[in-house]
Amino acid sequence: MCDRTLYAVEVGLMNVNDIKIVEGSIDDLENVYQRFTADFANDELKGYEHLKQLMSKKRYKLLLAKDPIIHEVVGYAFIYEFDRLQGIWLDYMAIDNQFRGTGYGALLFKKLTKWRQNGFSGIFIEVEIPEEKEGFTRENQLRRIRFYERLGAKRLPIPYQLPTNDSGLPMYLYFWPSPDVELLPKELIQEAISEVFAYIHSDIKHKDDVLMGFYTLNV
């Protein structure tokens, strides 16, 4: 099982060119989608038509990471901009195969932290919980956690689940706070999760059951 930002993990920060973040169009989505389906596990994928519908509502965006020196799209991210909370939800982030492990993932994330200049609160990130069994998978999972923590993200002390077609998948929920923002109060975190479930996961029939389970555990 991979988390929704698996392929952004860097094994070491190398000298890479700066990148430019460009908002993608529906035409870009068509080009990215084949790569997207290869990057993430089937139970974590969104269908093409659903992503297209989300993007048409303007708050859900496809962002392309372009290296202007080599004229390549080196990665991409899908983000959701909150209605009231001045922050974003990082739904997916991936770096192209040939550029993984070179530093582009960290560079892309740092660009996202500057997505808004004024009043930006931070970024929510879903991260896979490490499995108990020692081995390659667990080490990769721990490395992803170190990646985000090194960039300043903090794990929220809540039992979060990602709604999938089959059930709710337990995940860690991290939050990267802007330098002038403390960790968000519980009420704002719950509001953010509720908004994401209603907007991003509108295609999941039992999303409300997963959400109610979250509220029950947090009363």
Task: Report each predicted region and the residues it spans.
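Conserved active-site alpha-helix within GNAT-family acetyltransferase domains
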Residues: 129-157
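Short amphipathic alpha-helix that is part of the acyltransferase structural core
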Residues: 7-50, 195-202
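A short, internal acetyl-CoA/4′-phosphopantetheine-binding micro-motif in the GNAT/acyltransferase core
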Residues: 93-100, 129-130
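Conserved GNAT acetyl-CoA-binding A-motif
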Residues: 116-136
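A conserved beta-strand-loop-helix scaffold within acyl/acetyltransferase catalytic domains
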Residues: 41-69, 73-94
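C-terminal "cap" of GNAT-fold acetyltransferases
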Residues: 140, 154, 161-210, 214-219
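Conserved acetyl-CoA-binding loop-helix of GNAT-fold acetyltransferases
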Residues: 101-116
